[in-house]
Amino acid sequence: MAVTCDPEAFLSICFVTLVFLQLPLASIWKADFDVTGPHAPILAMAGGHVELQCQLFPNISAEDMELRWYRCQPSLAVHMHERGMDMDGEQKWQYRGRTTFMSDHVARGKAMVRSHRVTTFDNRTYCCRFKDGVKFGEATVQVQVAGLGREPRIQVTDQQDGVRAECTSAGCFPKSWVERRDFRGQARPAVTNLSASATTRLWAVASSLTLWDRAVEGLSCSISSPLLPERRKVAESHLPATFSRSSQFTAWKAALPLILVAMGLVIAGGICIFWKRQREKNKASLEEERE
């Protein structure tokens, strides 16, 4: 039995196939939603926690979607969540045991991962992906880590002609600002060295100055972060009494040559006057004897 083909049906099939081939492949995978992240970087304190939050638009439920947070460069999984369950298989060891999925608002299209015990290595850009079948949307979340470190300490040591004050601190991130002032509020120039740990990337600070001004009663050391300009840690130190005594001794040492020169001039002048008067007396005596 011969199979016949309706020419009109064949043309219809060809037309539909042609239209389908004309469609961009990207439109097949394009999601019916957008994913948005924070508009500004998120500030996280070293040792604290940070929340990586992303939002669906429109506000549809994400309960049945695959949700993934990962480091954009390179692509390392921070946390994965799918259909109400955490998927730990692809999570990198750096994040195991310190991420928590917050499911409070997933039904309204808002999802968040909380990362605990923040370190300097969390200072980077992250990506969040919401995937529904073969369709997905992505957004980025930038995290900036800040740390003021330990309280600064000032160590004062006597020098031959002054005093040396060194301010030290550790655990700062990123590079900190160091400011040295005296108790009158006057800035004091100092030599500051900053060094970063190869293992923690935290910065250590050592700022030293030598003070020659005997009128200064004490010094302060202020450390602040460029990410937290309104917050700072300050240490103050009164100069020891030995510095004032050594300062007085140094002042006497500086004045002693002048005093000796002045005394020498006075003595020399006195001797000159004495010999001049003695000569005049001797001359007068000789003239009287001649008369």
Swiss-Prot record:
Subcellular location(s) of the protein: Membrane
Stretches that traverse the bilayer: 255-275
Pfam family, one: V-set
Extracellular side, ranges: 27-254
Gene3D superfamilies listed in its UniProt record: Immunoglobulins
Cytoplasmic face residues: 276-291
Chief location: membrane
Record keywords, A-Z: Disulfide bond, Glycoprotein, Immunoglobulin domain, Membrane, Signal, Transmembrane, Transmembrane helix
Highest taxon of source: Eukaryota
UniProt-listed GO biological process terms: regulation of cytokine production; T cell receptor signaling pathway
Segments forming domain Ig-like V-type: 27-146
GO cellular component labels: external side of plasma membrane
InterPro entries named in the record: BTN3A2-like_Ig-C (IPR053896), Ig-like_dom (IPR007110), Ig-like_dom_sf (IPR036179), Ig-like_fold (IPR013783), Ig_V-set (IPR013106), IgSF_BTN/MOG (IPR050504)
Cystine bridges: 54-128
Glycosylation sites: 59
GO molecular function: signaling receptor binding
Membrane topology according to the record: Single-pass type I membrane protein
Signal peptide interval: 1-26
Record family assignment: Belongs to the immunoglobulin superfamily. BTN/MOG family.
Matches recorded under PANTHER family: BUTYROPHILIN (PTHR24100), BUTYROPHILIN-LIKE PROTEIN 10 PSEUDOGENE-RELATED (PTHR24100:SF133)
Name of the protein this chain belongs to: Putative butyrophilin-like protein 10 pseudogene
Species assigned in the record: Homo sapiens
Gene: BTNL10P
